[in-house]
Amino acid sequence: MSQALTLARPYARAAFATARDEGAFAPWSDALAFSAHVAVDPRVAALLANPELGRDDAVALLAPVSHGETYSRFLAILAESHRLPLLPEISGMFDALRAEAEHVVKATVTSAAELSAGELDAIKVALRKRFNREVDVTTAVDASLIGGAVIDAGDVVIDGSLKGKLARLQTALAN
């Protein structure tokens, strides 16, 4: 995994720089997400591994309908370098670079039960205040948390789950 990230990093940075220069973060992000989604399909991955598949055919297979010429050239470079399987990593890194440039923190809130709109808004306000940035929140439900929630915002993890509190209590009692 770390080797894939290392190999993907320069391509993600190049895509980001191009998107920044074009003022087209959203279209590039959407195109990369589409291409990454297509590239991970097992049938497409098998096609991409076939040495008889030409560069132009690979680009046509992975490029969204509404892509620009620059994006096609980017995919062609990936195809020539045999880096098309790295599209999921490139897409993820691109989105991280975009979030940083746009001063947005991406957070995942995993709760024991579905959050109400009011609870989600309160979490967004608290995270916005803590990070002093806009917050893009995705939610997930994990009943094993018993109660509460776990917030994962980049390098920061806030475990307010009952499961986490019980684990910390068990550790404290064991010591």
Swiss-Prot record:
GO molecular function: proton-transporting ATP synthase activity, rotational mechanism
Location relative to the cell: Cell membrane
This protein's GO CC annotations: plasma membrane; proton-transporting ATP synthase complex
InterPro entries assigned: ATP_synth_OSCP/delta_N_sf, ATPase_OSCP/dsu
Topology within the bilayer: Peripheral membrane protein
Pfam (any one): OSCP
Entry superkingdom: Bacteria
The keyword Membrane appears for this protein: yes
Keywords of this entry: ATP synthesis, Cell membrane, CF(1), Hydrogen ion transport, Ion transport, Membrane, Transport
Family per record: Belongs to the ATPase delta chain family.
Function: F(1)F(0) ATP synthase produces ATP from ADP in the presence of a proton or sodium gradient. F-type ATPases consist of two structural domains, F(1) containing the extramembraneous catalytic core and F(0) containing the membrane proton channel, linked together by a central stalk and a peripheral stalk. During catalysis, ATP synthesis in the catalytic domain of F(1) is coupled via a rotary mechanism of the central stalk subunits to proton translocation.
Database matches in NCBIfam families: ATP_synt_delta, PRK05758.2-2
Quaternary structure note: F-type ATPases have 2 components, F(1) - the catalytic core - and F(0) - the membrane proton channel. F(1) has five subunits: alpha(3), beta(3), gamma(1), delta(1), epsilon(1). F(0) has three main subunits: a(1), b(2) and c(10-14). The alpha and beta chains form an alternating ring which encloses part of the gamma chain. F(1) is attached to F(0) by a central stalk formed by the gamma and epsilon chains, while a peripheral stalk is formed by the delta and b chains.
Protein name as catalogued: ATP synthase subunit delta
Gene name, Swiss-Prot/TrEMBL: atpH
